[in-house]
């Protein structure tokens, strides 16, 4: 079956058109132009702000003119992750999609259902001639995935809606009313190099086959972090062998749990056999520890050409200790909402090469003070090893308002349509609502969406039936918005 044969047809057709346009975070120029052209082609009031956000306004349908205005909001960018063996350029190529049973997925890359399905649904409402809806202000933000740049840059006074529906939640039976804030923690230092020992052999050491996933929504699931596993291997072996590091390249985006890490190392040739046995045993240890959550975990060791220079040994010890000590994973659970992560950290990327090392983390929390506490804990670990540490991109959480009028409306429509009560939740991820609310404090907000699994990884997929359910839900909400 083709994507465009799925229901609702207009939504899926829009998703296909959107995914034909390259739209990785930080490189949204093409999709911004696409969306501006789309709005103008419909003859609708279309505006691009100085940050790159696109706002398209559509008058109410006949008979709905006295209803409160609704902002429909989704982000244009997508996480650009691919499998190592996938040849793909996110800056020039469109996503290759396919129907796989009950799901739609991509071929070896992220799908972009996060948040492309939301974008496509808003496009369908803007296109419609027969859908009952109040006045619509469609807000398409940029760079949600790597800095919330669009939400942060949106000025007050551009929107007049009473309610905002964020379409970026990933479980079809959930209504989100709160989320975590976050801060980027970056550690940097230079290091001395020495000539590679003459009696050495070189290897490429790889950690592969990990689950990956969203560093907020999946952080509590026990998935392994490739950067932490690589550091554990190097730390353990450096205490037993004359091991030197030439390069490390691990992880990718801050909001994705790292799936792979690759290092170039050397050991004394007289230790070659013992070293290979040690790696084999450590691999078995890790596979046993992560047998349930990481069934495809693998560690590969292959000979490679000798590098010219390697890291000075004392500095190497300092760096390995720092990464080992830096906290990763769930730091604190919520005291008020069952099973909700309050505070966490993801050691997202490690780059070590040519005398420089960079470590990039994303610290999240629903509590501003706990967020700062964990960030300081991580900073302290790295500063002990001579790193310079900086905090950037801090953004606030979204405080739940359980008595909001829009929440009552949304819950009622869900119960009427599906005969069951939705889960009202807060999430451990960075929705834009908290940031948007700083300039629009009286605007009531909720978030919902279709079921998406594996977001931020090449395993990303969206459930087909949930998209149709989400669409019916969205239309029912719009039809039942109250009078001004």
Residues covered by each model-derived region:
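Substrate-recognition/cap regions that form aromatic- and gly/pro-loop-enriched pockets
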Residues: 340-429
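Active-site-adjacent substrate-binding region
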Residues: 218, 225-227, 232-248, 392, ...
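Zn-dependent metallopeptidase/amidohydrolase metal-coordination segment
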Residues: 7-11, 335, 342-355, 418-476
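Acidic, glycine-rich active-site loops and adjacent beta-strand->loop/helix elements
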Residues: 76-78, 139-147, 169-172, 211, ...
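His/Asp/Glu-rich mid-to-C-terminal helical/loop segments that flank catalytic regions of hydrolases
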Residues: 223-240, 269-272, 317-324, 332, ...
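Midchain, well-structured core segments that form catalytic/ion-binding scaffolds
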Residues: 102-105, 145-146, 152-364
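Acidic/His- and Gly-rich active-site-bordering loop/insert found
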Residues: 2-102
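Active-site metal-coordination/substrate-binding segment of hydrolases
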Residues: 64-146, 151-155, 161-162, 188, ...
């Amino acid at each position: 079956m083709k994507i465009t044969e799925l229901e609702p047809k207009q939504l899926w057709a829009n998703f296909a058109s959107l995914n034909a346009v390259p739209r990785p975070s930080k490189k949204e120029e093409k999709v911004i132009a696409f969306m501006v052209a789309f709005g103008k082609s419909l003859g609708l009031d279309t505006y691009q702000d100085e940050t790159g956000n696109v706002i398209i306004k559509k008058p109410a349908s006949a008979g709905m003119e006295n209803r409160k205005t609704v902002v429909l909001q989704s982000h244009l960018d997508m996480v650009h992750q691919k499998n190592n063996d996938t040849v793909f350029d996110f800056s020039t190529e469109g996503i290759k999609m396919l129907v796989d049973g009950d799901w739609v997925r991509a071929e070896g890359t992220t799908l972009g259902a996060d948040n492309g399905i939301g974008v496509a649904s808003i496009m369908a409402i803007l296109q419609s001639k027969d859908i009952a809806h109040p006045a619509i202000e469609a807000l398409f933000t940029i760079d949600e995935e790597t800095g919330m740049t669009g939400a942060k840059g949106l000025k007050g006074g551009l929107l007049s809606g009473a309610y905002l529906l964020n379409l970026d939640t990933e479980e079809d039976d959930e209504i989100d009313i709160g989320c975590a804030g976050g801060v980027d923690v970056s550690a940097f230092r230079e290091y001395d190099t020495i000539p590679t020992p003459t009696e050495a052999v070189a290897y490429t050491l790889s950690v592969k086959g990990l689950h990956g996933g969203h560093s907020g929504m999946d952080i509590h699931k026990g998935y392994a972090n490739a950067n932490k596993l690589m550091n554990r291997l190097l730390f353990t072996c450096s205490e037993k062998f004359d091991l030197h590091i030439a390069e490390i390249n691990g992880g990718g985006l801050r909001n994705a749990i790292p799936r792979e890490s690759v290092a170039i190392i050397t050991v004394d040739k007289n230790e070659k056999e013992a070293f290979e046995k040690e790696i084999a045993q450590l691999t078995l240890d890790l596979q046993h520890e992560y047998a349930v959550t990481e069934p495809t975990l693998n560690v590969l060791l292959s000979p490679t050409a000798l590098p010219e220079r390697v890291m000075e040994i004392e500095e190497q010890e300092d760096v390995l200790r720092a990464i080992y000590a830096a906290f990763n994973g769930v730091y604190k659970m919520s005291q008020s909402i069952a099973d909700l992560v309050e505070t966490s950290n993801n050691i997202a990327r490690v780059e070590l090469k040519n005398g420089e090392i960079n470590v990039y983390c994303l610290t999240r929390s629903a509590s501003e003070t706990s967020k700062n506490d964990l960030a300081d804990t991580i900073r302290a670990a790295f500063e002990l090893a001579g790193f310079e540490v900086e905090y950037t991109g801090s953004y606030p959480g979204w405080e739940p308002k359980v008595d909001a009028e829009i929440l009552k409306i949304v819950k009622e429509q869900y119960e009427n349509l599906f005969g069951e009560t939705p889960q009202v939740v807060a999430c451990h991820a960075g929705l834009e609502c908290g940031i948007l609310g700083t300039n629009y404090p009286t605007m009531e907000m909720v978030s919902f969406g279709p079921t998406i699994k594996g977001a931020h990884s090449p395993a990303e997929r969206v459930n087909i039936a949930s998209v149709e359910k989400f669409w019916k839900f969205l239309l029912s909400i719009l039809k039942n918005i109250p009078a001004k």
